Amino acid sequence: MKLDKYTVGKRYGKALFELAVEKNQAEAIYQELLTLREVYHQVPGIGDILSDDRLEPYEKDSIMEKLVTGFSEMMQNFLRVVYEYRRMYDLLLMIDEYERRYDEHQGLILGSVTTAIPLSKEQHQAMEEKAAQLLGYEQAHLVNLIDPSIVGGVVIEANHQVIDGSIRKQLEHMQQKLLK
């Protein structure tokens, strides 16, 4: 059974993170992955090129050697495994998973806070502190999204969890109770 790219991304990202933690290289690998992500953004088709069967193996090997040059031995080995299993087009998903685990390991959660109007700097900071506390993290970084349709209140989304304290949701809940 062929695995979907999200499952592959999670597995490879998790494996790399666990190895990096075991070898006390989590920060260094994280920095290398940020560099690699930048390369992927500068050359968007590189993952597809390295996975393309129409190219001769020696051509892909040459590109691959240029790509891994300058990275640590662990990162080079990881990239070679990903390349050998023809998963270079899934690399950004692997990086995302590693980054999620790295942030979690650091006690940091990333997410969003949706409000009807923009938050002030003080409100935004207070919201991040409250979200971190509610979700059990040391700190949170939340992007403020604006959606006037929530009427008021806030909706916090982080780590596949949603805390909906919007006026819209409260009104919907009251409407359901009244209709019963």
Curated annotation (Swiss-Prot):
InterPro entries: ATP_synth_OSCP/delta_N_sf, ATPase_OSCP/dsu. Its main location: membrane. It comes from the Bacteria. It is found in: Cell membrane. It is a peripheral membrane protein. GO terms for cellular component: plasma membrane; proton-transporting ATP synthase complex. Keywords: ATP synthesis, Cell membrane, CF(1), Hydrogen ion transport, Ion transport, Membrane, Transport. GO terms for molecular function: proton-transporting ATP synthase activity, rotational mechanism. The keyword Membrane applies. Belongs to the ATPase delta chain family. NCBIfam families: ATP_synt_delta (TIGR01145). HAMAP family: ATP_synth_delta_bact. F-type ATPases have 2 components, F(1) - the catalytic core - and F(0) - the membrane proton channel. F(1) has five subunits: alpha(3), beta(3), gamma(1), delta(1), epsilon(1). F(0) has three main subunits: a(1), b(2) and c(10-14). The alpha and beta chains form an alternating ring which encloses part of the gamma chain. F(1) is attached to F(0) by a central stalk formed by the gamma and epsilon chains, while a peripheral stalk is formed by the delta and b chains. F(1)F(0) ATP synthase produces ATP from ADP in the presence of a proton or sodium gradient. F-type ATPases consist of two structural domains, F(1) containing the extramembraneous catalytic core and F(0) containing the membrane proton channel, linked together by a central stalk and a peripheral stalk. During catalysis, ATP synthesis in the catalytic domain of F(1) is coupled via a rotary mechanism of the central stalk subunits to proton translocation. This is ATP synthase subunit delta. It comes from Enterococcus faecalis (strain ATCC 700802 / V583). The lineage of its organism: Bacteria, Bacillati, Bacillota, Bacilli, Lactobacillales.
